[in-house]
């Protein structure tokens, strides 16, 4: 699997190419959690979001389909006793309905064959009054962003779709999810976080 193969160098490449964006978006997402929150993170990767979230929330279950990525995330969060790591499929989570206050799925929607199924699962496990947070890399008109996507695809990332800001907004509208706000960290490859609130 591509993500297992690159798990050992993923952070190095990401930090060199897009470190400013990653720092801003992870801090923003973590700021949406607090000490009373039980959080589920899907597609946690190497733990880029996991560590700052774990430092703020009550509990975090961090999941990924790639065991290599999970191993890197576990190393990164080894001093956080409130984190549990599990292998899981974002389209078929084993958690009970309405189990989490915050549900995070970063940089994964564009990789999925069936993003609607994933969105429905994220909605299912989010508690009423909770928040679903979906940060995703988007393209802008600059050459560097599109080249980055092509580079990762060439290595085997298998992007199913690419978004710019407009098409990312339209993506959620077409699926019937009302996004209360968007937050974009700008840089070489911007990252836009969609915030979906599940009303009580």
Report the location of each language-model feature.
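Conserved class I S-adenosyl-L-methionine
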Residues: 1-34, 48, 72, 76, ...
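Class I SAM-dependent methyltransferase SAM/SAH-binding core
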Residues: 40-92
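Acidic carboxylate diad motif detector
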Residues: 134-136
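A short SAM/SAH-binding and catalytic strip from SAM-dependent methyltransferases
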Residues: 102-114
């Amino acid at each position: 699997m591509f993500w297992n193969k690159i798990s050992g160098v993923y952070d190095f490449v990401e930090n060199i190419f897009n470190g400013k964006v990653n720092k801003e978006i992870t801090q923003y997402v973590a700021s949406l959690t607090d000490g009373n929150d039980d959080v589920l993170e899907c597609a946690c990767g190497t733990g880029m979001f996991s560590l700052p979230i774990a430092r703020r929330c009550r509990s975090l279950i961090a999941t990924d389909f790639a065991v290599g990525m999970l191993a890197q995330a576990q190393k990164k969060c080894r001093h956080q006793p409130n984190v549990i790591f599990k292998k899981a499929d974002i389209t078929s989570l084993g958690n009970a309905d309405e189990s989490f206050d915050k549900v995070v799925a970063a940089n994964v929607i564009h990789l999925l064959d069936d993003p609607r199924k994933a969105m429905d699962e994220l909605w299912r496990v989010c508690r009423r009054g909770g928040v679903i947070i979906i940060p995703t890399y988007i393209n802008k008109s600059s050459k560097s962003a599109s080249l980055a996507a092509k580079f990762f695809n060439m290595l085997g990332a298998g992007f199913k779709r690419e978004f710019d800001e407009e098409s990312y907004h339209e993506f959620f509208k077409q699926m019937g999810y009302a996004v209360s706000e968007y937050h974009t960290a700008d840089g070489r490859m911007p990252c836009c976080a969609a915030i979906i609130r599940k009303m009580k």
